[in-house]
């Protein structure tokens, strides 16, 4: 996969090398000047795109702030299952908004 660093000895995703974002993200985003929705999946993407040091929980708590152009999402990992169970608003509020926004853009 594009800039995927591989797995640790325990089978977890390794963090992306900083060179990936420095080398590719601005160049890739420039290819899509009419991009209407960016899904920031995981803390690394959120920190880079939002230029923040906030935790995943802090960023996710402010998910409405950058709508309709940006929507942060947790990394799809078993490690986030506990977070998802504690933050029921994610499934109740954020996911329906994501579905609505994608449908809107698909028209």
Annotate each PLM feature.
Residues 1-107:
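Glycine/proline-rich loop-helix segments at beta-alpha junctions forming the active-site rim
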